[in-house]
Amino acid sequence: MNAPEPVQGKPRKRYDAGVMKYKEMGYWDADYEPKDTDLLALFRITPQDGVDPVEAAAAVAGESSTATWTVVWTDRLTACDMYRAKAYRVDPVPNNPEQFFCYVAYDLSLFEEGSIANLTASIIGNVFSFKPIKAARLEDMRFPVAYVKTFAGPSTGIIVERERLDKFGRPLLGATTKPKLGLSGRNYGRVVYEGLKGGLDFMKDDENINSQPFMHWRDRFLFVMDAVNKASAATGEVKGSYLNVTAGTMEEMYRRAEFAKSLGSVIIMVDLIVGWTCIQSMSNWCRQNDMILHLHRAGHGTYTRQKNHGVSFRVIAKWLRLAGVDHMHTGTAVGKLEGDPLTVQGYYNVCRDAYTRTDLTRGLFFDQDWASLRKVMPVASGGIHAGQMHQLISLFGDDVVLQFGGGTIGHPQGIQAGATANRVALEAMVLARNEGRDILNEGPEILRDAARWCGPLRAALDTWGDITFNYTPTDTSDFVPTASVA
């Protein structure tokens, strides 16, 4: 956008009518020192050819706070110097001369307390379609403690969940029922029973199983909870199955959640695509009803995967922790879905840290104090199997749910054998780690030793032991070690 030239050499004043450059309207301040109470955002921007990156950064700050395309006299009726967002730093992205990192500070008073919907309406509501910018991606955010404290956060959290399940010192195990569409309620319940009886802690609905002609939601809930209760009685362990309450209206979702509660379920599930207001509402319901809330990140790849445009999943994970989910899918790094190992570990930091430290190699550009919000249990799911157990535990530690869907239900000896294979592999690896062995390097040997005494594990390793998904990740961390303000 080209601003008019000054008339007869006279400099334009801030509130003269007409179009001005954003950086001249106060949306760029290279000397600005962010305050502890500022909300900070890092954008990756690709300006149009010929557009000054500083002007592009100022435009992002302006269009995500108080600016419009022309000077408006009503600015003078506000405390506009405070309400203007301020771009304060621009760095070139390494090895990409067209892209720039721009840092923007927002005054806390610009945002409604405890509302992710309001936050996202400002930060991503308008700037991503702004013509002077070819592409924009929200890479990271820092929330001030005062803002974090306006959110309730997870209703259960990792510690309380483990206490309810009475399971400590190891990752939890789960599986998604497959095929995810087409089973009758009775057959669906049978799959759940076999998986839980074989040694899994959880079974799970997939993202698109709701209430279809082949299986009404009420039938699924009834057969699943019958399976959960029978498996719990048979094993002496607390078991659960994520019942997906996603529906077309909020009222229907509450109705399904209430029915799940009446059947004794300990956990329900919603999809990311239901939206932020719905997610926060279901979190509040779970808090009031002592339920765990699992979040399936359905649809996230439409805006998180591309490196030059969209929203990084680390930002989505931060919003979800504020919104109050107890579980969220965060990637596997070794499975079938997109995920650079270091970047994925950064997502796990966001879920589990009390205080997240800046770590540029993991894509974490800001320190974040979580102000005593409970921690989210990350979930690794998608194309993983027992032969990768050493890699998964080395990458993610104990506080994670490892979900083996096809790696359980596709077992050549049946579903219960698949679950047993995963449980034995997990127990063997945790034991070896606790004995001080190098499980990352000795993992295959540890698994083969355990398989000598476990036929299901031996069959799993013979079937999938050499299966890997070695593709180059599209979303990796870029960073600038030192500032180079334009």
From Swiss-Prot:
The active site is at 178 (proton acceptor), 296 (proton acceptor). Mg(2+) binds at residues 204, 206-207. It comes from the Bacteria. The modification N6-carboxylysine is found at residue 204. One of its GO terms (molecular function) is magnesium ion binding. It catalyses: 2 (2R)-3-phosphoglycerate + 2 H(+) = D-ribulose 1,5-bisphosphate + CO2 + H2O; D-ribulose 1,5-bisphosphate + O2 = 2-phosphoglycolate + (2R)-3-phosphoglycerate + 2 H(+). Pfam families: RuBisCO_large, RuBisCO_large_N. GO terms for biological process: reductive pentose-phosphate cycle. Its EC number is 4.1.1.39. The record marks 336 as: Transition state stabilizer. Its cofactor is Mg(2+). InterPro entries: RuBisCO (IPR033966), RuBisCo_large_chain_AS (IPR020878), RuBisCO_lsu_C (IPR000685), RuBisCO_lsu_C_sf (IPR036376), RuBisCO_lsu_fd_N (IPR017443), RuBisCO_lsu_N_sf (IPR036422), RuBisCO_lsuI (IPR020888). Keywords: Calvin cycle, Carbon dioxide fixation, Lyase, Magnesium, Metal-binding, Monooxygenase, Oxidoreductase. It is an enzyme of class 4 (lyase). RuBisCO catalyzes two reactions: the carboxylation of D-ribulose 1,5-bisphosphate, the primary event in carbon dioxide fixation, as well as the oxidative fragmentation of the pentose substrate. Both reactions occur simultaneously and in competition at the same active site. The basic functional RuBisCO is composed of a large chain homodimer in a 'head-to-tail' conformation. In form I RuBisCO this homodimer is arranged in a barrel-like tetramer with the small subunits forming a tetrameric 'cap' on each end of the 'barrel'. PANTHER family: RIBULOSE BISPHOSPHATE CARBOXYLASE, RIBULOSE BISPHOSPHATE CARBOXYLASE LARGE CHAIN. Heterohexadecamer of 8 large chains and 8 small chains. This is Ribulose bisphosphate carboxylase large chain. It comes from Cupriavidus taiwanensis (strain DSM 17343 / BCRC 17206 / CCUG 44338 / CIP 107171 / LMG 19424 / R1) (Ralstonia taiwanensis (strain LMG 19424)). The lineage of its organism: Bacteria, Pseudomonadati, Pseudomonadota, Betaproteobacteria, Burkholderiales.
